[in-house]
Amino acid sequence: MYIIKVGGGSGINLDGVVADLAAIKEPFIVVLGANAARDHLAALTGHQKIELTSVSGYSSVYSDAEAIDLIMMAYSGLRNKRFVELCQQNSINAIGLTGLDARLVQGKRNKGIKVRE
């Protein structure tokens, strides 16, 4: 089985990705990013994205309650279902799940990072 990560940036060619997936004969799971969709929804709703940089140089997005709502709308809603639709149009029988569904993915909360001001 293959696990394939597809980025969530605005430059991702999903039509090309799905065409490549249609040629795969082995079972696969796609992990789909949606950061561009999240940023677009944030702009539409007037929510300003806050980026943080740790002292080690790692960048991340601060996620307050409104940002979490936008993340869920983008990842499990728009991007997920549009990708499933595109797969179905290309004869790939697909289902879109998130890590929240049936606790498919569980992680440990980061205890915090030291942020550069």
Task: Annotate the PLM regions.
Residues 1-117:
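Nucleotide/pyrophosphate-binding catalytic subdomain
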